[in-house]
A protein has these predicted regions:
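Hydrophobic structural segments
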Residues: 1-258
Length: 258
């Protein structure tokens, strides 16, 4: 019999809590106790993912984004933590600690682009390294293709939408940071990167990055992070071979792209 705490210990080995940012809320956030035979790995715990876990008879969901982040002042049937407890499904959420972890979100992202001689930046969260020389538009197309192949397909539209800023030079040294990392363009420049690939970047990040000679690729928050779910599932299976670990097929990008 595998317990909730055994899985939590295994997840702490995969993504040590001491790697988390001080403002974050990772950990065992919903504990329904009991034995666990099957786990669902996801990026987000949405009502659709809870329903999927229940349908697949999973007693636990392991996610990247915390199902509880801000303090709860009230809770009801429309709230996902309520839905988890009602279904008897526990939740372990590993957020910024999984971003920074060895083999975590950003190392998985770096691996997609075959980065070599990797270093960390942004307080250990991001990764920067050498890649085979490539033009920015070609790298953006590669990001769209490779990430789409690793994400759940939407019901309508393309799986991944990529925006890019071309500073006019080929990319030999790439910085990656998943999610909302556009504000870290100066950190990428300080590490000698030619391009920063992230999930989200705003209008002013794009203008400033180009002005300073850094190309920027924004490939989507979901698309840059969902690929880690397969890696987490594989690590958890290796740690607890008797545990069945599935990857969510219902956890999709919340946006629909034209």
């Amino acid at each position: 019999m595998i317990t909730v705490n055994q899985i939590y210990e295994a997840m702490q080995a995969i993504a040590p809590l001491e790697l988390a940012e001080h403002w974050d809320n990772p950990g065992l956030l919903v504990d329904c106790g009991g034995a666990v035979h099957r786990v669902l790995a996801a990026l987000d715990i949405t009502p659709e993912v809870v329903a999927e876990a229940a349908a697949k008879q999973c007693e636990m969901i392991v996610s990247h984004h915390p199902v509880i982040f801000d303090p709860l002042k009230k809770i009801g049937p429309q709230d996902v933590p309520f839905q988890l407890v009602q279904a008897g499904i526990s939740a372990i959420c590993m957020h910024t600690n999984l971003d920074a972890a060895e083999g975590g979100v950003n190392e998985v992202l770096a691996g997609i682009f075959d980065m070599k001689n990797m270093e960390t930046f942004a307080e250990g969260c991001g990764r920067v390294g050498a890649i085979e020389e490539i033009a920015v538009p070609e790298l953006a197309r590669k990001a769209q293709q490779e990430l789409a192949a690793r994400c759940n397909q939407p019901k309508n539209g393309p799986a991944v939408q990529v925006k890019f800023v071309d500073a006019g030079k080929p990319v030999k040294r790439l910085a990656v940071i998943s999610g909302a990392g556009g504000s870290l363009f100066a950190d990428a420049i300080a590490m000698g990167a030619d391009c920063l690939l992230t999930g989200e970047a705003n209008h002013h990040h794009a203008i400033d990055a180009k002005r300073l000679g850094l190309s920027l690729i924004a490939a989507g928050h979901y698309a840059t992070e969902f690929p880690v779910t397969a890696a987490v599932a594989a690590k958890l299976r290796a740690a607890l071979p008797e545990l069945e670990v599935l990857v969510s097929t219902e956890n999709r990008d919340p946006y629909t792209y034209l």
